[in-house]
Amino acid sequence: MTKIELRALGNTGLKVSAVGFGASPLGSVFGPVAEDDAVATVREAFRLGINFFDTSPYYGGTLSEKMLGKGLKALQVPRSDYIVATKCGRYKEGFDFSAERVRKSIDESLERLQLDYVDILHCHDIEFGSLDQIVSETIPALQKLKQEGKTRFIGITGLPLDIFTYVLDRVPPGTVDVILSYCHYGVNDSTLLDLLPYLKSKGVGVISASPLAMGLLTEQGPPEWHPASPELKSASKAAVAHCKSKGKKITKLALQYSLANKEISSVLVGMSSVSQVEENVAAVTELESLGMDQETLSEVEAILEPVKNLTWPSGIHQN
């Protein structure tokens, strides 16, 4: 059995699986997931070589953390065998990036996850807060938690790419260890590429999420609330239909496209069933043994060309 490739994450010394386990679906965000299924999914992912699990108290109003905690506990392996990231600042009730809330947040998360520490604690979707508060209050609070051993490393997440440079230019080097970007490294949008040299120069590890663009590049299509423009939605639909007509799965192609760039340490994919885990792992191992289906990829890229790198607004206006 091919083990999934492990990649170095910035300067952290962590080695994360090229595919990471996105645990938001365990919070029944996209439909109900039974506890037994959640536990079985985590177990299968770990068995097949996925060692990196990502969650947040926001996903499913804390349910994702609880389910992931149960799944990890059931593995009955040493804590150092897996890497866990959770987040703070975004909750079902809204956003709160204050030092006080962050302190409370990690204690609550650790209890739900049944862990003594997390490997990475991210500020979640910082474009919805004041970036200056993130720099002057939130990140220093996270540094304190790092000193106390509640998290090993600190990260920031969000959609607009300029939030990363804004914060990283204003905090001491080595303060932020990791960034998590989503929807900016996939077949339809690869704008994260432009930022990679900058992030490398800062010694910051890069995690990319949503290679399927939050459902745009799937046969079932995006959820009703998806913020993409009608143009982007219809081009994506055409790309999906093209793959289907050739008997190919766009999800596999899209995931492989994201995985092919080794500068990105891990690509997070949401998983809520054993079959999804197996499908994702097969995509990785096939990429390593057979390479990409270049012909279909070129055809899909041609269909998406008119909407390439189109994104959508996210966050509040920063003055």
Curated annotation (Swiss-Prot):
The entry's keywords: Carbohydrate metabolism, Galactose metabolism, NAD, Oxidoreductase
Entries under SUPFAM superfamilies matching the protein: NAD(P)-linked oxidoreductase (SSF51430)
Domain SIS: 122-269
Molecular function, one GO term: L-galactose dehydrogenase activity
CDD domains: AKR_galDH
Gene null: resulting phenotype: Lower leaf ascorbate concentration with accumulation of L-galactose when grown under high light conditions.
Entry protein name: L-galactose dehydrogenase
Native organism: Arabidopsis thaliana
Annotated gene: LGALDH
